[in-house]
C-alpha cells in the first residue's frame, strides 16, 4: 500500500477536488432512524392488464401510473405519450411475445413480496438524505423491461427492471448473458442498483467521458457512496466479482497501476480504450486474470484513499 500511495500521490489533489464537490459529504452522518420506503407495483398492475386485456384497466393505469407509463413507453417501447391512440395496443403486442410474457410472469412471481428490498432502500435512502440534505427521495417502482436497462429514473421517480434480477442460475439467462453478467443479476443487488441509479440521476457525470481518470473517479465515487449506504453488501458483490477475482485485484493493485501509467491510458482522451476499462467483460487487454470493470474498482480505491487524507 505504501508503494501504491507513492504512485498515485500526484493524483490525490485531482481526486480530492472531484470528491469534495457539493455532491459528496465531507463528514459522514450515520442516521439512527429509517425512512419508510414503499415500492409501488406498476409491474403487477401492468401484467394484470396484459393478461386480461380489459380496456377498463387502461383508465386505472393512466390514473395511478401516468409517469411510469410515459417513461416505460418512451424508454423501452419507443412510444409516444400514453394518451396517443394505439398506445395500449402496442404495449400488449410487445409484452405478449411468448418468451417475454413467461419472463414477466416469472419475475412478478419471484418478486411477489419485496419487504426485504424496501427495508434496504429505507436504510439506504436514509443514509443518502442524511449526507445529501438537498436530495429528493424518489417514488420507487418496479417494472419489467424485457432485458433492457436495469434502472429507469425521471423527475422524482425511480424504477427497477426486476426481470434483470432473477438470480444468476435463472434458466433464460443462460441463453442471453455471459457468466460475468449473470453474477450481477441477483436480488441481493437490487437495492444497490436503485441507489446507484438515483445517485447518477441526481449527480450526472460532468467530466470528459473519453478520459479514463475522470470516468474512474466518477464511477468509483458512486460505488463508494453506495457501499457506505449499504455496508452489508460486500465490495466483491457490489463489483459483481467472485471473491477470488476481488482478491486478485487487491493483490495486483500496484501492477495494475504500473501498467495503466506505462501505457499512458490515464489522461489520454481515447473513448475506445476508456470504455474497455468500464466494460463488464474481463479486461484481458491488461492481463488474462483481470476482471471486468476494473476502471470502476480502481476509481473506488482512489476515492477511498483520497478521502482518508482529507
Language model features: what each stretch is:
Residues 308-310:
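Conserved small/polar residues in nucleotide/adenosyl-binding loops
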Residues 1-7:
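Positively charged n-region of N-terminal signal peptides that target proteins for export
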Residues 18-20:
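C-terminal motif of bacterial Sec signal peptides marking the signal peptidase cleavage site
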Residues 90-246:
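Acidic/His-rich structured neighborhood in mature extracellular/periplasmic domains
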Residues 22-89:
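N-terminal mature-domain "stem" immediately C-terminal to a signal peptide or N-terminal signal-anchor/transmembrane
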Residues 49-60, 193, 197-202, 216-305:
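An amphipathic alpha-helical core segment
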Residues 45, 60-64, 71, 75, ...:
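Residues that form generic nucleotide/phosphate-binding pockets
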Residues 7-16:
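Sec-dependent N-terminal signal peptides
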Amino acid at each position: 500500500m505504501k508503494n501504491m500511495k507513492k504512485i498515485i500521490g500526484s493524483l490525490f489533489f485531482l481526486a480530492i477536488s472531484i470528491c469534495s464537490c457539493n455532491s459528496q459529504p465531507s463528514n459522514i452522518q450515520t442516521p439512527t432512524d429509517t425512512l419508510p420506503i414503499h415500492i409501488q407495483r406498476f409491474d403487477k398492475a401492468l401484467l394484470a392488464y396484459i393478461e386480461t386485456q380489459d380496456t377498463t384497466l387502461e383508465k386505472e393505469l393512466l390514473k395511478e401510473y401516468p409517469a411510469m407509463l410515459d417513461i416505460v413507453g418512451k424508454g423501452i417501447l419507443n412510444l409516444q405519450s400514453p394518451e396517443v391512440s394505439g398506445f395500449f395496443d402496442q404495449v400488449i403486442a410487445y409484452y405478449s411475445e411468448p418468451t417475454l410474457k413467461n419472463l414477466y410472469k416469472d419475475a412478478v412471481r419471484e418478486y411477489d413480496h419485496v419487504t426485504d428490498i424496501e427495508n434496504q432502500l429505507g436504510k439506504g435512502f436514509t443514509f443518502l438524505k442524511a449526507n445529501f440534505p438537498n436530495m429528493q427521495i424518489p417514488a420507487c417502482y418496479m417494472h419489467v423491461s424485457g432485458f433492457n436497462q436495469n434502472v429507469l429514473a425521471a423527475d422524482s421517480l425511480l424504477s427497477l427492471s426486476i426481470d434483470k434480477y432473477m438470480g444468476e442460475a435463472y434458466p433464460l439467462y443462460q441463453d442471453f448473458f455471459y457468466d460475468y453478467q449473470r453474477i450481477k443479476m441477483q436480488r441481493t443487488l437490487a437495492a444497490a442498483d436503485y441507489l446507484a441509479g438515483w445517485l447518477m440521476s441526481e449527480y450526472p457525470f460532468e467530466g470528459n467521458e473519453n478520459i479514463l481518470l475522470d470516468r474512474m473517479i466518477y464511477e468509483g465515487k458512486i460505488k463508494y457512496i453506495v457501499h457506505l449506504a449499504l455496508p452489508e453488501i460486500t465490495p466483491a458483490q457490489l463489483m459483481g466479482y467472485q471473491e477470488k477475482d476481488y482478491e486478485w485485484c487487491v493483490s495486483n493493485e500496484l501492477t495494475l497501476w504500473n501498467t495503466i501509467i506505462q501505457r499512458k491510458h490515464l489522461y489520454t482522451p481515447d473513448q475506445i480504450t476508456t470504455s474497455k476499462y468500464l466494460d463488464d467483460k474481463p479486461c484481458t487487454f491488461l492481463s488474462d486474470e483481470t476482471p471486468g470493470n476494473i476502471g470502476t474498482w480502481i476509481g473506488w480505491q482512489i476515492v477511498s484513499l483520497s478521502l482518508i487524507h482529507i
